[in-house]
From Swiss-Prot:
Gene of this entry: prfA
Family: Belongs to the prokaryotic/mitochondrial release factor family.
Protein name: Peptide chain release factor 1
Lineage: Bacteria, Pseudomonadati, Pseudomonadota, Gammaproteobacteria, Pasteurellales
NCBIfam families: prfA, PRK00591.1
Major localization listed first in the record, in broad terms: cytoplasm
Length: 360
């Protein structure tokens, strides 16, 4: 391992020890903000410090074991142990490289998840409902909490659009690569000829930003409309104008929220979603991504805009970004999607490592 990396790891280890001492001081314990910040930093360093300690132990173990090579009775055992330790060192170094990659500060935040039906009519709406159920089951398995902010139900079941907030540790980091076009191929229940139909939905995932990181929004840039909350088929579910629609005039971004009975609560939630969308758009613009960030995140709902295909006749799910196919569609639709999410995260980390190698 490079001397510069070892030096960085040593400084992180020292910082970890310093934080451990600070967290025991009464002045820090009595300052909630400071205690929370130090605790978070301490927890973030935990994995890299443990892995570095393991790496050090393995190197020391090799040095000690090499002393046994001159002993005929111990030589074979020593050679085997050295070989095993070298393999473990290689694994530890790979893990340390990943742990040292620049962290996306948004990864630890809650996330807004938006699912929108695209091409395919009623079947696209039904599939949007299936995706919502899939993500809800996944969230349940992670002990995350799902809060529906706005749901525009489809007459045949499912949703034209649904926006939810997923609360939990590291939600955005796990779900952010779900943004994009999701395509389904199956025979609809209403199809009498048994023909396979293709429909599409789009998914957008955005971090819920803390108040101090939210972009400033000029109230004069907003148009706020109120209306009555409605259920499926346009039926009114209450008699007051509690639902809120906010339009950000400069960007044209529109957010609706009708989950709460209180207009003030719906407005607060809608403003939070709006702030996240504006921040996401600005982040993408600064990164010189597509100018139309909302379109980039949500896609157009067109069949060609796809990251993943769910093929029911063949019982398979294919992620087109990394050419990954799994033949456990039923399990996936029941929320077992780690085997789809983790390979994407691993691929992203590999890309980051390659980029760092090129820079070095």
């Amino acid at each position: 391992m490079k001397a510069s990396i070892i030096s960085k790891l040593e400084s992180l280890k020292e910082r970890h020890e310093e934080l451990e001492a600070l967290l025991g001081e009464s002045s820090v314990i009595n300052d909630q903000d400071k205690f929370r910040a130090y605790s978070k930093e301490y927890a973030q360093l935990e994995d890299v410090v443990k892995c570095f300690a393991r790496w050090n132990w393995l190197n020391n173990n090799i040095e000690e074991t090499q002393l046994l090579l001159d002993d005929p009775d111990m030589k074979e055992m020593a050679e085997l142990e050295i070989e095993e330790s070298k393999a473990e060192i290689e694994n530890a170094e790979q893990q340390l490289q990943i742990l040292l990659l620049p962290k996306d500060p948004n990864d630890e935040y809650n996330a807004y998840l938006e699912i929108r039906a695209g091409t395919g009519g009623d079947e696209a709406g039904i599939f949007a409902g299936d995706l919502f159920r899939m993500y809800s089951r996944y969230a349940e398995s992670k002990r995350w909490r799902v809060e529906v902010l706005n749901a525009n139900e489809s007459e045949q079941g499912g949703y034209k659009e649904i926006i939810v907030k997923v609360n939990g540790e590291g939600v955005y980091g796990q779900l952010k690569f779900e943004s994009g076009g999701h395509r389904v191929q199956r025979v609809p229940k209403t199809e009498s000829q048994g023909r396979i139909h293709t429909s599409a939905c789009t998914v957008a995932v955005m971090p819920e930003l803390p108040e101090n990181e939210m972009p400033e929004i000029n109230p004069s840039d907003l148009r706020i409309d109120t209306y009555r909350s409605s259920g499926a088929g346009g039926q009114h579910v209450n008699t007051t104008d509690s639902a809120v629609r906010i339009t950000h005039i400069p960007t044209g971004i529109v957010v609706e929220c009708q989950d709460e009975r209180s207009q003030h609560k719906n407005k607060a939630k809608a403003l939070s979603v709006l702030a996240s969308r504006i921040a996401q758009a600005e982040q993408e613009r600064q990164a010189q991504a597509q100018a139309d960030t909302r379109r980039n995140l949500l896609g157009s709902g067109d069949r060609s805009d796809k990251i993943r295909t769910y093929n029911y006749p063949q019982g398979r799910v294919t992620d087109h970004r990394i050419n990954l196919t799994v033949y456990r569609l039923d399990e996936v639709m029941n929320g077992k999607i780690d085997e789809l999410i983790q390979p994407i995260i691993t691929e992203y980390q590999a890309d980051q490592l390659a980029m760092l190698s090129e820079q070095n």
